């Protein structure tokens, strides 16, 4: 995945780059290695992720990491490029995130964003929402708000234009991962479902995840042997700051 997203970047080596939702910092460090006369800042809302990145990936003098909310970035007209890879779909208040990204970019600079859009196929997040509303689980989620963004590529483009960007390019692809076993798929779920499972007692979390994946197989399994396939759409959007 890292090689895919890095291939999207046309770097001269002198840019100042911001990586929004940098996670463990690995991709951010690879960007830093391509900027011999530039620099990159990786930000993430998770203090734990930033601590990991600082301890494991801060190996370049032109690389910094900081805890920051994508909706409230504390920069102004500073970056030549903003990138974000599979992070922004976890921010339902996307207007705020896009406005924030627009503010930190220099005029006529670019944002290269990769996220998971809504598509024709029912998503894993759609199934999570259906599952938590069923009678067995609904009582645990009375105050719950869906943490996921559900926009089609077309809707995302309109949203970006509304927040001061011009859509320079959009690419959509259907992706699939084969986890090959239920245990591996459940391990993935234990991380991916955390915004839902944190509302459950510890003893119910495995049952909830199993219920979700059983329901998901009904919409994602197209043929025998595909019981542990995760299918999703990926959108790469290039935005120009006006």
Regions found by a protein language model. Name each.
Residues 1-15, 30:
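Conserved alpha-helix/loop element of class I SAM-dependent methyltransferases that forms part
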Residues 6, 29-32, 98-102, 129:
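A structural alpha-helix within SAM-dependent methyltransferase catalytic domains
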Residues 16-20, 24-72:
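Class I SAM-dependent methyltransferase SAM/SAH-binding core
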Residues 95-110:
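A short glycine-rich, Lys/Arg-flanked "PGG" loop and its adjoining helix->strand segment in the class I
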């Amino acid at each position: 995945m890292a090689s895919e997203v890095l291939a999207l970047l046309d770097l001269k080596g002198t840019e100042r780059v911001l990586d929004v939702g940098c996670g463990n910092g690995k991709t951010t460090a690879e960007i830093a290695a391509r900027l011999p006369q530039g620099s990159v800042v990786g930000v993430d809302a998770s203090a734990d992720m930033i601590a990991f990145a600082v301890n494991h990936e801060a190996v370049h003098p032109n690389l910094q990491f900081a805890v920051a909310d994508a909706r409230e970035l504390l920069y102004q007209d500073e970056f030549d490029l903003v990138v974000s890879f599979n992070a922004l779909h976890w921010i339902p208040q996307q207007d705020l995130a896009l406005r924030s990204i627009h503010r930190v970019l220099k005029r006529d600079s670019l944002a290269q964003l990769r996220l998971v859009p809504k598509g024709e196929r029912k998503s894993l997040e759609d199934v999570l929402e259906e599952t938590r509303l069923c009678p067995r689980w609904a009582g645990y989620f009375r105050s719950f708000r869906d943490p996921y963004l559900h926009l089609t590529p077309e809707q995302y483009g309109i949203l970006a234009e509304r927040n001061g960007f011009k859509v320079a390019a959009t690419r959509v692809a259907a992706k699939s991962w084969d986890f090959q076993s239920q245990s591996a798929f459940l391990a993935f779920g234990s991380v991916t479902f955390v915004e839902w499972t944190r509302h459950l007692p510890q003893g119910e979390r495995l049952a909830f995840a199993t219920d979700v994946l059983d329901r998901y197989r009904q919409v994602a399994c197209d043929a025998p042997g595909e019981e542990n396939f995760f299918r999703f759409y990926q959108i790469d959007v290039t935005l120009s700051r006006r």
